[in-house]
């Protein structure tokens, strides 16, 4: 009954998490001051903090029900397990700032990927004893949020943004944010994100706004912020400049328009081609390549701009012009093309802007003023045709810039905006990576890092929006300058000093800052900067910044530049780049293709643990990840496999308690071989997994844990443990309990829910209200090796090889399951022979031999082996012979089998001999590798000789 109530309770919580519902503390507006870290924010989970685990008398159900994930998560959070401990650690705190998703967002697979990867790292470092801060938050998403609310107003029939006015519109946006802004973080909780939600940040929190203002003013004081006219991406539908990240490119088929550019004072003309005829009205030159003999005689002359009323522009030579493209003559419009703008700077050309903010032609368009840019395109071409200036049109495919939010074609134009001079800051970012202060994983992204920062352009940081950080600049009527200040009072003080009387009103710049400006301060502003808070001292610089490679420059590079500028330190030690999540065919997911996967649908069907494991295992840093539902199903089955192992162990581990540390060498030495083996392999896996996670080989760590559980623990040790009796029972139970707990601890960062649930059932029988696997120490120690027994590992690997050989013979000969074989085992290794003899029950269970008929001898001569017995060479010094009576197969078939085996070994020998005869290998390979190759060759030669002898014996018996 209790379990049924629990599952219903968990399902209710899952629904709340999916919708983003539940109680949430209202975030104050910018007008509400508060301390730098703010009050603890409450959980979005509308569930009481009960222990969602089975009682001592309740057995594990037959199947794992992942609907318990939600209630388990609520319990973790209520226990404060996501908050950094106060413990000291030699390596200091582990800090990972979460990339803040847009407050308007809904969880997608990109979010799911970073949540899984960052949560794995956070859980691992907590388990290693480091105070761990995974700091979450959301971004105000200026364009997206403003656009969303504007559309909501329109759908309601409410007054528009401009009709409401700035203050009332912002009140409406804050109301939307308070009501809906918690949805994305609630959905992240469904994935098990163990972020410290008590420190959750929003980029428009008052303390964050103070940091943004401080940063802007400091940059201005150093002369790094300026107001000027430069080329920007302009979104006519949004009426603002937008960042490169908010521009998407589509391959579209358009036209290339060929026309005559008449040479002034003659009948001669230059043939010119353009894809945007409307921009002719903004031309300020025509350029040709200085090496182009066709037009050399025209350089230095003037030509007449079509449909301009006779305006003339110069014909200039410039190396940028491609002789082979179009006609080889390039119309130059510095006001509306990025490349033309650069030519204009080189050639000192004037800039003419022909567009209004809404995409219509301004007064510089002459007779076309007021027309939409695309209507103008048609009209001016028709007029040019009528004037006899048209040569031809031809189809032309090009990459067209599209506004991600507005949906329309982006217009490059020169606009007066606020810019940050990034030259010096960019050089510091280059040095930080080159000097090793920052490590980029994978290393191949370093080349792109250097290339981008060494060629960085000044950063346009102003946006013509209302929602965001309003630029801290004030203007006074009748005064040509402006006042950049931390507050209006400070601006007034500056104005007085400039001779502006107090009766003159100050007007604040209406623009807001680029969202990337505030998020560029994220690693240090979230922990108290510009104040020297205890958190700033403890958690900055961050240890790792984990994010997608697609925002390496838009966000990561800017954080590095800002961190170095304002704190003098690199904001993080490591930049870990993950790839994009693609579909099972490795194609990019898109709505048009119909292959988009909603992670919440996957969680509903398979559970968060299965999705997390599918996203991160097999992942290589920086590589895109194909995701199929078959893979998720496999990992759901992995959850079930762990669950079933726990059900098998449950009666054996009654009263078990958490291990108080790793098994030490003395205890290990007293165990039987099988137990020494599984403990040694558990320790080996723990150390390898820890090393992989420390080195950010996250997928490799998950794979190792998976393979240890499946290939060593479940498939081998659990099976042989069923044969333990007498004095071995106690050692077996100790090894089972210990090895399974190691499994749970190694898998926990990847699959936190199922592992926590099982750990509580099997290892917290006392019902300690605060004990948690999440808070348990990682099995691998820092700075100390775990106990291991190399002899036990060697013996067990050989024993496993024997079992596999016996199974292979059965499979090849089609021996019925009920038939027990009686092999003769020739084993030259006395210790291995003793193990085989002592563990005949286990051998019988796993390979279906009759223990009473098994013979173990040191040499073939020591046994009475029939000449026609089937032989299999397991390894050097280990062979198996099965009598024909067990196989019921004829000699001819056995000769054929041995012949194929001998042929394969002969090929191996030829390959090894060829390698050793190759001077390039023998002379250049490490001596150890050469010696190992010689040893392999000797072993293969011996195996071939044994097989040849067996073949000869069989031939003689025919």
Locate the predicted segments by residue:
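Conserved short loop/turn motifs at secondary-structure junctions
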Residues: 4, 60-62, 110, 137-140, ...
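N-terminal, positively charged nucleic-acid-binding surface of large information/translation enzymes
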Residues: 44-291, 316, 333-365, 384, ...
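Active-site-adjacent bridging/hinge elements
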Residues: 90-98, 120, 156-160, 185-192, ...
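N-terminal chloroplast transit peptides
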Residues: 1-25
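N-terminal mitochondrial targeting presequences
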Residues: 17, 28-48, 52-54
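Structured ligand/cofactor/substrate-binding pocket environments in proteins
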Residues: 110-123, 129-130, 138-139, 208-211, ...
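Secondary-structure transition/capping motifs at alpha-helix termini
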Residues: 123-131, 152-163, 186, 190-195, ...
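Feature 926 captures the class I aminoacyl-tRNA synthetase adenylation module centered on the KMSKS loop
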Residues: 46-49, 258, 451-517, 521, ...
């Amino acid at each position: 009954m209790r379990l049924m109530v629990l599952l219903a309770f968990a399902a209710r919580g899952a629904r709340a998490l999916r919708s983003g519902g539940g109680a949430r503390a209202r975030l104050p507006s910018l007008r509400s001051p508060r301390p730098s870290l703010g009050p603890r924010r409450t959980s979005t989970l509308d569930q009481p903090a009960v222990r969602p685990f089975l009682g001592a008398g309740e057995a594990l159900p037959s199947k794992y029900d992942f609907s318990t994930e939600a209630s388990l998560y609520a319990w973790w959070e209520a226990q404060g397990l996501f908050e950094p401990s106060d413990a000291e650690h030699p390596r200091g705190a582990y800090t990972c700032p979460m990339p803040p998703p847009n407050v308007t967002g809904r969880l997608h697979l990109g979010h799911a990927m970073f949540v899984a990867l960052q949560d794995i790292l956070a859980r691992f470092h907590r388990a290693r004893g480091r105070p761990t801060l995974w700091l979450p938050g959301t971004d105000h998403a200026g364009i997206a949020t403003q656009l969303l609310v504007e559309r909501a107003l329109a759908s309601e029939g409410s007054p528009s943004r401009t009709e409401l006015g700035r203050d009332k519109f912002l009140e409406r946006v804050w109301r939307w944010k308070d009501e809906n802004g918690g949805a994305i973080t609630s959905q992240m909780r469904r994935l098990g994100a163990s972020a410290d939600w008590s420190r959750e940040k929003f980029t428009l929190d008052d303390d964050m706004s103070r940091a943004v203002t401080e940063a802007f003013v400091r940059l201005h004081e150093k002369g790094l912020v300026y107001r000027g006219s430069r080329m920007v991406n302009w979104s006519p539908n949004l009426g603002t400049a937008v960042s490169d990240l908010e521009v998407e490119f589509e391959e579209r088929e358009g036209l290339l328009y060929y026309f005559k550019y008449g040479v002034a004072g003659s009948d001669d003309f230059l043939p010119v081609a353009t894809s945007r005829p409307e921009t002719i009205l903004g031309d300020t030159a025509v350029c040709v390549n200085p090496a182009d003999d066709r037009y050399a005689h025209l350089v230095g002359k003037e030509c007449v701009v079509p449909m301009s009323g006779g305006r003339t522009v110069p014909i200039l030579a410039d190396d940028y012009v491609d002789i082979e493209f179009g006609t080889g003559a390039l119309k130059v419009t510095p006001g509306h093309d990025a490349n033309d703008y650069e030519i204009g700077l080189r050639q000192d050309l004037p800039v003419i802007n022909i567009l209004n903010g809404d995409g219509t032609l301004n007064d510089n368009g002459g007779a076309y003023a007021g027309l939409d840019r695309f209507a103008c395109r048609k009209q001016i071409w028709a007029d040019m045709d009528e004037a006899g200036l048209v040569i031809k049109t031809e189809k032309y495919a090009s990459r067209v810039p599209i506004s991600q939010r507005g949906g329309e074609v982006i217009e490059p134009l020169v606009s007066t905006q606020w810019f940050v001079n990034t030259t010096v800051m960019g050089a510091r970012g280059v040095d930080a990576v080159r000097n090793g202060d920052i490590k980029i994983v994978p290393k191949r992204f370093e080349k792109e890092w250097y290339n981008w920062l060494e060629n960085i352009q000044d950063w346009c940081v102003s946006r013509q929006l209302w929602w965001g950080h309003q630029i801290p600049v004030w203007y006074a009527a009748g005064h040509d300058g402006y006042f950049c200040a931390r507050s209006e009072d400070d601006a007034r003080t500056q104005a007085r000093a400039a001779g502006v009387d107090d009766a003159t009103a100050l007007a604040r710049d209406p623009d807001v800052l680029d969202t990337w400006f505030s998020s560029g301060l994220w690693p240090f502003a979230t922990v108290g900067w510009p104040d020297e808070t205890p958190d700033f001292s403890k958690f900055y610089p961050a240890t790792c910044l984990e994010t997608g490679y697609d925002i390496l420059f838009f966000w990561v590079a800017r954080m590095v530049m800002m961190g170095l500028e304002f704190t003098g330190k690199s904001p993080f030690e490591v930049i870990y780049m993950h790839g994009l999540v693609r579909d099972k065919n490795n194609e990019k997911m898109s709505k048009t293709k119909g292959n988009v996967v909603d992670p919440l649908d996957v969680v509903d069907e398979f559970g968060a643990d299965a999705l997390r494991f599918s996203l991160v295992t097999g992942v290589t840093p920086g590589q895109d990840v194909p995701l199929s539902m078959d893979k998720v199903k496999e990992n759901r089955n992995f959850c079930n496999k762990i669950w079933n192992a726990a059900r098998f162990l449950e009666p054996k581990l009654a009263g078990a308690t958490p291990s108080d540390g790793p098994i030490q060498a003395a205890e290990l030495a007293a165990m039987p071989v099988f137990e020494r083996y599984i403990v040694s392999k558990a320790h080996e896996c723990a150390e390898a997994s820890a090393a992989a996670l420390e080195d950010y080989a996250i997928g490799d760590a998950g794979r190792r844990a998976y393979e240890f559980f499946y290939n060593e623990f479940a498939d081998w040790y659990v099976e042989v443990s069923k044969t333990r009796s007498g004095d071995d029972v106690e050692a077996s139970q100790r090894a089972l309990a210990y090895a399974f707990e190691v499994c749970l601890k190694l898998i926990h960062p990847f699959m936190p829910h199922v592992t926590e649930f099982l750990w509580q059932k099997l290892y917290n029988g006392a019902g300690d209200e605060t004990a948690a696997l999440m808070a348990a120490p990682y099995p691998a120690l820092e700075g100390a090796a775990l106990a291991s027994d190399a002899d036990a590992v060697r013996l067990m690997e050989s024993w496993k090889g024997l079992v596999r050989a016996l199974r292979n013979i059965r499979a090849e000969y089609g021996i019925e399951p009920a038939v027990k074989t009686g092999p003769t085992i020739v084993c030259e290794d006395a210790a291995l022979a003793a193990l085989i003899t002592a563990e005949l029950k286990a051998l019988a269970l796993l390979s279906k031999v009759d223990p009473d008929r098994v013979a173990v001898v040191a040499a073939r001569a020591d046994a009475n082996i029939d000449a026609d017995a089937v032989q299999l060479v397991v390894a050097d010094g280990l062979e198996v012979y099965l009598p024909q009576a067990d196989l019921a197969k004829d000699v001819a078939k056995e000769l054929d089998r041995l012949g194929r085996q001998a042929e394969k070994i002969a090929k191996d020998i030829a390959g090894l001999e060829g390698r050793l005869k190759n001077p390039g290998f023998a002379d250049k390979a490490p001596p150890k590798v050469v010696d190992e190759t010689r040893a392999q060759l000797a072993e293969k030669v011996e195996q071939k000789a044994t097989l040849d002898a067996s073949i000869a014996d069989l031939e003689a018996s025919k």
